[in-house]
Swiss-Prot record:
The keyword Transcription regulation applies. Homodimer. This is Redox-sensing transcriptional repressor Rex. It is found in: Cytoplasm.
């Protein structure tokens, strides 16, 4: 969802890419970078980078570029990555288990703190350091741990019901792997990851190549 007093959604989506590239630069021992050099790393024009950053203030100096560490700090603050974000994960099938085991979240200030499923055969099983809980307990856990973020990895037919319960419990942002569009209030953000839809969009280009 996008609000009139916010930068365009596409700008927000690029900020994590900028942050990741800046971290790589620091790891390489590079402490100053131009818009052109940063843009080449993520296939974005220098003008676009300057425009994106201008929504949030003045960064860098003409002819000198950006201080990598300072710019990274500013972007992390803009994204709220200077604080801890607890996340609940609902749906612990093969995909959910892979997400639960992914180690890249914690280094970015994001931590999966609870796993939920409605399958009695899965409840009580351990995935990494966490035990799968009954989805019936999700309201209590969301309240206790002050969770605002959730990941949904359930079948499409269950996704809306799961989202409704999470939102009623206090969740305000959902990352959904379910192949359906969720109906949510205006003050709730939803992002979708649908590998099938992405692959189908890519087959369009492959099919066009075959026609020529």
């Amino acid at each position: 969802m996008e609000r009139s007093d916010q930068p365009p959604d596409v700008v927000i989506r690029r900020l994590p890419l900028y942050a990741r590239s800046l971290r790589y630069l620091l790891e390489e021992g590079i402490h100053s970078v131009s818009s052109q050099e940063l843009g080449e790393r993520i296939n974005v024009t220098a003008a676009q980078i300057r425009k994106d950053l201008s929504y949030f203030g003045e960064f860098g100096k003409q002819g000198i570029g950006y201080d990598v560490e300072k710019l990274l700090h500013h972007i992390e603050r803009i994204l709220g990555l200077n604080q801890h974000w607890p996340v609940v994960l609902v749906g612990i099938g093969l995909l959910g288990q892979a997400i639960a085991r992914y180690e890249g979240f914690r280094s970015e200030g994001i931590e999966i703190v609870a796993l939920f499923d409605s399958d009695p055969a899965k409840i009580g099983q351990r995935v990494g350091d966490l035990v799968i809980q009954d989805f019936a307990n999700v309201r209590r856990v969301v309240a206790e741990k002050q969770v605002k973020l959730a990941i949904i990895a359930v079948p499409a037919l269950q996704a809306q019901r799961v989202a409704d319960v999470l939102i009623e419990a206090g969740v305000r942002a959902i990352l959904s792997y379910a192949p359906m569009i969720l109906q949510v209030p205006e003050d709730v953000w939803v992002r979708y990851i649908d590998p099938v839809a992405v692959l189908q969009s890519m087959t369009y280009y492959l099919a066009r190549e075959q026609q020529h």
